[in-house]
Regions:
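Active-site nucleophile elbow and catalytic-triad environment of alpha/beta-hydrolase enzymes
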Residues: 198-216
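Alpha/beta-hydrolase-fold enzymes
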Residues: 50-51, 64, 68-187
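Short, surface-exposed "cap/lid" segments of acyl-processing enzymes
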Residues: 1-26
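Conserved alpha/beta-hydrolase "nucleophile elbow" surrounding the catalytic nucleophile
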Residues: 56-60, 229
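Conserved alpha/beta-hydrolase "acid-adjacent" motif
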Residues: 233-239
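Catalytic histidine-centered segment of alpha/beta-hydrolase-like enzymes
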Residues: 260-276
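Conserved acidic catalytic loop of the alpha/beta-hydrolase fold
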Residues: 25-27, 36-54, 65-70
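Short beta-strand/loop motif that positions the catalytic acidic residue
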Residues: 219-220, 226-228, 232
């Protein structure tokens, strides 16, 4: 579903995107993968790509990405990215609670352990690994808007009857991507549910990475842009914007917030309104952060194009990283 996000930035930025392996394809002998590991990978990717990175985190990765940057800032890491753009992310799910948030709080973590975790079956390489199956996530998302999905399939049938192959093909292309889900390791899924949606550890200042506290007040140099959708029923309006209040030491010149009218969760990072209204604002924000970060000593050096990396972080003379 990030295909359109990448395409929007390719003409003007150097783009890198994180590539996570489906848990059912990883042998159990390879060990665990949890939220701490995710943050470690984000930090490692940013360090690999260099200090001129601009990170984009779409939805769930907003939490581990901002946590990773807080840890880097606290350590005065020279590879701290120039900016981060958090899009439709659950930074503080106590704000504008959606049905997703209410379910997590109502059920509690033990319910998710009992009902959502299963072992990978044969003949998959990850046989016997405990995972949260991708089809569970897919079923949950589709159930939230089942009428819309039924209507979309009815429209496709009507297009086929009329001989409108182009419209039907667009429908197929969308669902080819929408239905492409992967399994998550049980430990990563359960930690995310517990820390982000049940205990709200990040906004309460209680989140830990390994043995270190995640201190968002340490973020001072990295710019922060938040993007939300007016009709988002997964990450409600205000949940991502909450990051600004949690990062009080970022200068005002390095901040931006945008609520896109008339779009839901997926419209925040894909579709015509994203291309026409959101992507240009992100590009302007990246340019602003890049300009403010330049020093006179670098005036004669290479400027480079902004690099867009997706997810954990990535590269460039000026780079944008996305999850």
């Amino acid at each position: 579903l990030l295909r359109g996000t990448v395409e929007a930035f390719l003409p003007t930025h150097e783009v890198f995107i994180t590539d996570w392996v489906d848990a059912r394809l990883v042998p159990i002998s390879e060990g665990r993968f949890d939220l701490d590991d995710y943050i470690d990978y984000v930090i490692g990717m940013l360090q690999l790509l260099g200090p001129d990175v601009h990170v984009m985190a779409v939805c769930q990765p907003s939490v581990p990405v901002i946590a990773a940057i807080a840890r880097m800032e606290a350590a005065n890491d020279p590879h701290t990215p120039r900016s981060m753009t958090l899009m439709g992310g659950p930074i503080d799910t106590r704000v504008s609670r959606t049905e997703v948030n209410k379910l997590a709080e109502k059920r509690g973590i033990e319910w998710f352990k009992r009902n959502c975790i299963h072992k990978v079956p044969l003949p998959n390489v990850g046989f016997m690994r405990d995972v949260y199956p991708g089809f569970f996530q897919l079923a949950g998302f589709m159930a939230m808007n089942i009428d819309r999905h039924l209507e979309a399939h009815g429209e496709m049938f009507r297009h086929l009857v009329k001989g409108d192959g182009d419209s039907a093909e667009k429908h197929r292309d969308f669902y080819d991507e929408y239905l492409a889900v992967m399994d998550l390791t049980a430990e990563f899924y359960l930690q995310t549910v517990d820390k982000v949606f049940v205990k709200h550890q990040l906004p309460r200042g209680e989140m830990m990475h390994r043995d270190h506290k995640v201190d968002l007040t340490a973020i001072r140099r990295c710019g922060l842009m938040t993007v939300e959708g007016e009709n988002d029923d997964i990450s409600g309006v205000g949940q991502t914007q909450a990051a600004h209040g949690l990062c009080p030491n970022i200068p005002d010149a390095l901040r931006a917030h945008w609520v896109q009218p008339k779009v839901g969760h997926y419209g925040v990072f894909n579709g015509s309104r994203f291309r026409a209204e959101i992507a240009p604002r992100i590009a302007d924000f990246i340019a602003t952060c890049e300009h403010l970060a330049r020093k006179p000593a670098r005036a004669g050096g290479k400027s480079g194009s902004s690099v867009v990396a997706f997810g954990g972080g990535r590269k460039g003379a000026s780079r944008l990283a996305q999850d």
